Amino acid sequence: MTDNINKESTTTTTTIDHTTNLLIDKHVEYIVKLGSKKDSFEYWVTEHIRMNGMYWGLSSLYLLKSLDKLDKNEVIQWLLSCQKSNGGFGGNTSHDDHLLSTLSAVQILIQYDALDKIDINSVVDYVVKLQREDGSFVGDQWGEVDTRFSYAAIMCLSLLKSLDKINCEKAVEYILSCQNFDGGFGSIPGAESHAGQIFTCVGALSILNEINKIDIDKLGWWLSERQLPNGGLNGRPEKSSDVCYSWWVLSALSAIDRLHWIDNDKLKSYILKCQDNETGGIADKPGDIPDVFHTFFGICGLSLMGYFKDQIESIDPVYALGTKTLQKLGLNLPWNKNL
């Protein structure tokens, strides 16, 4: 979070059972306070991904119906200070541009209905230039290739209504080349299947209306196998559960209409147990220290499963933005069951 953008929040004094209830007030307070913790280790080691952190924090507040708890103008001014001359955005004011931070910047501006604050064409040009001849995308000038970048580019251009500026056919071909025999996807061709990469590939293919080119049931089986006896989800076989996969796995299952293939109630229970009932926030595992990353994805998981409908907003499984926000943009969301 940036400095001095906190607004006064109300401290909750009532003791609530965090294993059965979502501690909304505490989570809001936790997120709002993040920007003031300049003396913490976490503040400085995450400096380079502050744009992503801002997206996670703001999106959490949106889902908790508390977006107004941060000063909109200060957030936008800080965001604009992170844009570079080539149109891309850095993770912070003093950091190089990157595709992932550029996507986060666009998502933040959309949530604030403030796309008019930037030169959209310059952002589009920046993203378009990152596509390679084989259809893949690099994340920045240094040339790393990853399916995360394909998703980020495709989603960013879709939000800016400029998908016609890239070779979508080649982009699809490259993504499909990253699919494995088990139905999952890796970061590059031949890489191990991982839930995070599956989320990006399913999301990109969904946006491009090419999800029918994969074996839905095989992928759904692989994803449903990620649920462990404790109710949580892991990202690949033989790994422990982690709240972040409540988004990576669930979003992909939701996009392919297989959300009912896992035990939603057990996952809900796992997420709630990962809440910190003293400070607020959600951790990766029960008893661990919370952070904004897992707080956001834990709330996202609960939203996707339809829990606490009266308390949290609906999120889209592909764009990772509020359903109402996307409806205002006039985007076609055939995979979203909340429409």
Curated annotation (Swiss-Prot):
Q: What reaction(s) does this enzyme catalyze?
A: geranylgeranyl diphosphate + L-cysteinyl-[protein] = S-geranylgeranyl-L-cysteinyl-[protein] + diphosphate
Q: Which Pfam families match?
A: Prenyltrans
> What biological process terms from GO does the record include?
endoplasmic reticulum to Golgi vesicle-mediated transport; protein geranylgeranylation
Any one GO cellular component localisation term in the record = Rab-protein geranylgeranyltransferase complex
Record-listed E.C. numbers = 2.5.1.60
Which cofactors does this protein require?
Answer: Zn(2+)
> What's in the keyword line of the UniProt record?
Metal-binding, Prenyltransferase, Repeat, Transferase, Zinc
Q: Which residues bind Zn(2+)?
A: D242, C244, H294
> Per its record, what are the GO molecular function terms?
Rab geranylgeranyltransferase activity; small GTPase binding; zinc ion binding
Annotated cofactor note: Binds 1 zinc ion per subunit.
Q: Which InterPro entries does the UniProt record give? A: PGGT1B-like (IPR045089), Prenyltrans (IPR001330), Ptb1 (IPR026873), Terpenoid_cyclase/PrenylTrfase (IPR008930)
In this chain the PFTB repeats are located at 24-65, 72-113, 120-161, 168-209, 216-257, 264-306
Q: Which residues form a coiled coil?
A: none
Chain residues that bind geranylgeranyl diphosphate:
194-196, 236-248
Q: How does it assemble?
A: Heterodimer of an alpha and a beta subunit.
Described function: Catalyzes the transfer of a geranyl-geranyl moiety from geranyl-geranyl pyrophosphate to both cysteines in Rab proteins with an -XXCC, -XCXC and -CCXX C-terminal.
Q: Say which family it is in.
A: Belongs to the protein prenyltransferase subunit beta family.
The protein's name in its UniProt record: Probable geranylgeranyl transferase type-2 subunit beta
Q: Which gene encodes it?
A: rabggtb
